[in-house]
Amino acid sequence: MSTFVSTTFGKISGRHGSAVAAKYRNGMNVLKVFTAPFNPKSVKQVAVRTKFKFVIDTLLCMNKLFMITFHGLGEFHHAVSLALKYAVTGTSPNFSLDYTKMIMSQGTVYGAEQLTVAKTTGTSVKVDWVSSLLPATALATDNVNLIFFNEAKKVVVLLQNCALRPADTIEVELPAEWAGANLHTWIYFSLADGSHNSLSEYISQVQL
């Protein structure tokens, strides 16, 4: 504990009235005016911390996904920041995520139009998109990536490079234990070398 020698009060250790003894890094002991700390538990601050914790807890199951989709952009921390900015709804303590507004990837690669997803048989789904409406600079070598999130089980599946842009359709099989589950689905595109992605696009929910 810092000690300050006062010509009036003698040796002062810790707080004395409105003053407190403090020690600088250079070893000098001084007497400073005591300032009460700002209340860290105001209603507004508690709401902010609760919101932040909610988003972290909710997205933690997608941590490995964001290591891929936001690689070099801050990964999980970037995903949390985007969710806080665009996808959180409700007021403290009753927050929720609007998954239709969740951004799962970002970049300058072209996306696609007229996105649909539908169950076929078992736990297989068919995803369709239209590339012909895009500028000619949308590359035929671009890869398609699909994201499926089982909110009830808190499990996410990323199917990377599962088709090429011109295919305009793909059927994929999801885990058998997901039968009957409601899934959130997204699509994004990436260059052939994986160096850049498109902005993710929410397709819709689909029940297996």
Residue ranges: model-predicted function:
Residues 1-111:
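Long, polar/Ser/Thr-enriched low-complexity segments
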Residues 74-208:
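Charged linear interaction tracts used for macromolecular binding and regulation
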